[in-house]
Amino acid sequence: MVTVENVYSHLNKLADVKLAEKWDNVGLMLGDYNNEVNKVLVCLDVTTKVVEEAIANNIDLIVSHHPLIFKPLKSLDFTEDFKSNIIRNLIKNDIAVISFHTNLDSATLGLNDYLARLLNLKDIKVLFEHSLDSTAGLGRIGKLEEPLDMGDFIKYIKEKYSLDTVSAVIGDENVISTVALLGGSGADFIYT
């Protein structure tokens, strides 16, 4: 029998919760470690639609990237608050939730490595090393196989990431050979 704890332990080997940023909330958000798991649903955010899909498909465990509970809950108001209703429906249907956020972003072979590999970057290095593991951390930096002018680079990003649009600020340098990336909200790191 596979349990919530078994799934959690396996995920933790891939992206240790110790790699999460101090401000983040990761791990078991809701549920019982001892519950049996037969079906898992993976999502970015635990939304009302995701929970409805989980209920309709008899899902035992949802694994999300973004935490179901990020800020401390002050109340569970079922008349007004959609998050409260999500939590109520999860509890009523005995569906557990595990969230792996910045630990998955930072992990070796985590989301930032995946984003770098989608661009076929070479000589990939960690942009901001984690204090506990120099092979892990937020962001990645690497070299393109060959330099691209800005227009071709934007087309390349759109193709590799399957995007319809890309916003760009074009500076004086119009040839791109080195790429730094940081999945998620990396605005705090722009001037680091």
Locate predicted features.
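Hydrophobic structural segments
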Residues: M1-T192
